[in-house]
């Protein structure tokens, strides 16, 4: 089973396309939609829904995948739920770049500080990060610098921030998922 978390643009038709692409890895892809506007509520909701999906799915090698803001959540929720994660262009600093788009961007600082101390060290090698060299929204080099000590970084030379085409990375994701 693969859980898919959308980015800030929850209504983008690209989300459906990504789910269809992920079904080449596993036919059981669960799209979990969340508000994107209320970070604390989103975290509680996502924890509950992802845990429920894992319990119902019965796949010992479940995976959570997210793009942009969904990548922020995939890393944290996947860690807390004990499953591997794939993050495409994860937005690691929504408190800096989501002002005016969400009600309380400062809640992301609170969430980051309340996550288990050193969680990335404890999560080492359990997240695969795919970054676009042409991300028009985020500083990919900064993201790589923060995550490279803990996770494998895969660079993509064609996609932009929304990462419409996952297909060049599906085999790598499939291999990563089989590691459980």
Swiss-Prot record:
<protein>
    <recommendedName>
        <fullName>UPF0227 protein YPO1616/y1776/YP_2238</fullName>
    </recommendedName>
</protein>
<dbReference type="GO" id="GO:0016788">
    <property type="term" value="F:hydrolase activity, acting on ester bonds"/>
</dbReference>
<dbReference type="InterPro" id="IPR008886">
    <property type="entry name" value="UPF0227/Esterase_YqiA"/>
</dbReference>
<dbReference type="InterPro" id="IPR022987">
    <property type="entry name" value="UPF0227"/>
</dbReference>
<dbReference type="GO" id="GO:0005829">
    <property type="term" value="C:cytosol"/>
</dbReference>
<dbReference type="Pfam" id="PF05728">
    <property type="entry name" value="UPF0227"/>
</dbReference>
<comment type="similarity">
    <text>Belongs to the UPF0227 family.</text>
</comment>
<dbReference type="InterPro" id="IPR029058">
    <property type="entry name" value="AB_hydrolase_fold"/>
</dbReference>
């Amino acid at each position: 089973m693969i859980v898919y978390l959308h980015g800030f643009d929850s209504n983008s038709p690209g989300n459906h396309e990504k789910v269809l692409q992920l079904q080449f890895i596993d036919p059981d892809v669960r799209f979990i939609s969340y508000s994107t506007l209320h970070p604390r509520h989103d975290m509680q909701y996502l924890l509950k829904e992802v845990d429920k999906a894992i319990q119902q799915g019965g796949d010992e090698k479940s995976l959570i995948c997210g793009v942009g803001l969904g990548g922020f959540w995939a890393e944290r929720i996947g860690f807390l739920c004990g499953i591997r994660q794939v993050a495409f262009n994860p937005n690691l600093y929504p408190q800096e770049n989501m002002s005016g788009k969400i009600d309380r961007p400062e809640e992301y600082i609170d969430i980051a500080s309340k996550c288990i101390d050193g969680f990335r060290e404890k999560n080492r090698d359990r997240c695969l990060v795919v970054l676009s060299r042409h991300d028009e929204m985020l500083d990919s080099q900064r993201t790589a610098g923060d995550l490279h000590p803990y996770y494998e970084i895969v660079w993509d030379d064609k996609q932009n921030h929304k990462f419409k085409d996952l297909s060049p990375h599906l085999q790598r994701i499939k291999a990563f998922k089989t590691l459980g």
